[in-house]
Amino acid sequence: MKIFTLAPKENWICDRFVHEWNSHYSEYCVSHPKDADIIWLLADWCWNQIPVEYLKNKKVVASVHHIVPEKFAGKEELDFKARDQFVDLYHVPCEKTRDQITPHTSKPIWVLPFWVNGSLWHRKKESVGELRSALGIDEKCFLIGSFQRDTEGHDLKSPKLEKGPDLFCDAVEKIFKEKKKEGIEARVLLA
């Protein structure tokens, strides 16, 4: 069995997923869809980059990461329906996404969370105190962290409002006020 995994080439998490998949399962991976038994549309929104003849003649798995209901009308819904005619199975990372796409397809939907790369996401050897010291952050300071990418992808300027940057800011304001009443400084670390 040979698998071609479609990367969006957007310098985003899906590109890393494809790279990690290909690195860990290289014996199953091919670099061109014509050589594959299965085409994995890990970046499902890029499906039309694959020639239709391959989509018709291969097994196709599409990963749907999430649907934004407010955006899933018109073009996005038409695009989903056009792609659905080629998809044999959907992969989604959570039940919420499964519930969102179920009304739009009769194809099987497999819920499987994304993996975590332990070489990237792990505890630092330094203690929290050592990290605070290295960053010049007082031990008593209350820290709030955010590492999500909140842009639309086609540029790094347009906010991705469904990720709730407004809600994050509201929560930060509330925490800052609460901590100030307690006499504690609060800071936000963005990555």
For every predicted segment, state its role.
Residues 1-52:
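N-terminal pre-catalytic "stem/leader" segment of glycosyltransferase-like enzymes
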Residues 5-7, 40-43, 113, 145, ...:
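Short beta-strand segments
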Residues 10-21, 93, 160-171:
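Conserved alpha-helical elements of sugar-nucleotide-dependent glycosyltransferases
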Residues 35-43, 53-71, 90-92:
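Active-site proximal beta-strand in glycosyltransferases
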Residues 55-60, 87-88, 106-108, 184:
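A short helix->loop->beta-strand "cap" motif at the edges of active sites that frequently abuts
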Residues 71-90, 104:
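Membrane-proximal helix-turn-helix segments that form the acceptor-binding/catalytic region
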Residues 88-100, 106-125, 137, 147:
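Donor nucleotide-sugar binding/catalytic pocket of nucleotide-sugar-dependent glycosyltransferases
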Residues 124, 128-191:
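Conserved catalytic-core segment of nucleotide-activated headgroup transferases in glycan assembly
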